Regions:
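Conserved N-terminal structural module of periplasmic/extracytoplasmic solute-binding proteins
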Residues: 4, 10-11, 18-98, 277, ...
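Extracytoplasmic/periplasmic solute-binding protein
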Residues: 137-141, 146, 164-207, 213, ...
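Extracytoplasmic/periplasmic substrate-binding proteins
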Residues: 44, 224-301
Length: 408
């Protein structure tokens, strides 16, 4: 249910980029000052139809640039570009959380031409998502986060505002005990005031889950095992919702159509509830993903590639994606567009995209070590395999593990 947000677990592939830097400088000067040439574009297979129209419009406005649109797999962007950068796409769709790895490996071309536009036109969290070490590398076009889907026949708008009332009035089907709990409940630590890789998500030694707030989070997770309003659900979450076994579940915009099929006009969607870890209600947070386009470091037509990437993430293009696919725009102006704010799921995502409700998923290379370590701690805590007396030691080990850069 993670919709391509999660990155692959492959580690950083070191690539010599000195020659590429020289080529970049040469291609950005002289005759290359005019955006022209042939550019290969990779987009996910399921979106090819939409992008054919967008690319056709781009070529009309930019007759000196010819785009070769090809199907790719955005979730595997780093791996696929690294295989053969010179043969890969000049512009490619990617989840933002691979940017740190790709930048460090010399695989991704910095946004040297449209950095100012990206910063001015998109919300701060989207800009943060495509920025690595104070340099903008990619071009955002959508934000996505998990939201709370619920049955409006079971809950009133007030009853979904706290985890306590949510699980007292009905039952939520969610995953504490299997793979994937890391993505849903890892942000609980940030909800309670902790940091994952520091305040900006770029410090390998900046995770501080091994404190009192972290212990409170583990105790809360353990308590959910005996909460009658919590039903352990993973792949069966949607069927449980449709059958009435559960009344709510947490997922992203990728589940919207399936939830509508399951609940019909009873479907509601809202931002996450608050949680009491023992010191009053705190806003439950989620990871925020930023869908983006990026330019291959080895492109032979950098100006043309950047021109295309910028067009694909423009206000006009983002509105097309919302209408045709359902992507929630990162563009500031569109986030106040009435057509978007009146959409139930989009409205919930816009609220979740605020810093009070989400944390931009870190793009640091070490994040690949976080996922398995976090899953193990959440799963075992929920199942009772970790006793309260061992919480501190487990969190110490978790923090140690998350600072490691995984090996190939």
């Amino acid at each position: 249910l993670m919709g391509g947000i999660l990155l692959s677990a492959s580690a950083v592939l070191l690539t010599a980029c000195g020659g590429a830097e020289k080529t970049k400088a040469e291609n950005e000067s002289g005759s290359a000052n005019k955006a022209a040439g042939d550019v290969k574009l990779w987009v996910d297979t399921e979106y090819m139809g939409v992008f054919k129209k967008v690319v056709a419009d781009f070529e009309k406005e930019n007759p000196d640039i010819k785009v070769n649109l090809t199907a790719g797999n955005s979730a595997d962007a780093k791996k696929d570009i690294a295989k053969d950068p010179k043969a890969a796409a000049d512009v490619f769709m990617m989840p933002h959380d691979q940017i740190g790895q790709m930048a460090e490996a010399g695989l991704i071309y910095p946004n040297t031409k449209y950095e100012k536009e990206v910063k001015e036109n998109n919300i701060d969290s989207a800009v943060a998502g495509v920025t690595w070490k104070d340099k903008v590398y990619a071009y955002p076009y959508a934000v996505e986060s998990q939201v709370l889907y619920y049955n409006k026949d079971t809950y009133s708008p007030e009853e979904i505002k706290t985890w306590k009332s949510l699980t007292e009035k009905g039952k939520i089907g969610t995953n504490f005990g299997e793979d994937g709990a890391n993505y849903i409940f890892g942000p609980l630590f940030m909800s309670n005031g902790d940091y994952l890789y520091g305040e900006n998500g770029e410090d390998p030694k900046g995770t501080n889950f091994n404190n009192q707030q972290g212990i409170e989070v583990l105790q809360w997770i353990a308590d959910q095992k005996n909460n009658p309003g919590v039903i352990q659900s993973n792949t069966e979450a949607l069927s449980n919702l449709g059958s009435g076994k559960t009344d709510a579940f947490l997922s992203g915009p990728w589940s919207k159509n399936d939830v509508e099929k399951a609940l019909g006009d009873k479907m509601g969607a809202a931002a996450y509830p608050t949680i009491d870890f023992g010191n009053g209600e705190k806003q439950m947070k989620a990871f925020l993903g930023v869908r983006s386009f990026a330019v291959n470091q080895q492109t032979q037509a950098p100006l043309a590639a950047m021109t295309l990437a910028n067009y694909l993430t423009s206000e006009k293009a983002q509105m097309t994606y919302f209408k045709e696919i359902g992507f929630v725009p990162s563009n500031k102006k569109l986030q106040t567009n009435e057509e978007i704010t009146q959409d139930t799921v989009a409205k919930a995502i816009l609220e979740m995209a605020q810093p009070t409700h989400s944390v931009v998923m870190p793009k640091i290379p070490e994040i690949v070590s976080f996922w398995p370590a976090m899953d193990a701690v959440i799963n075992d805590t929920y199942k009772g395999n970790i006793k309260p007396a061992d919480y501190q030691a487990k969190l110490d080990k978790l923090v140690q593990d998350t600072s490691k850069e995984a090996k190939e």
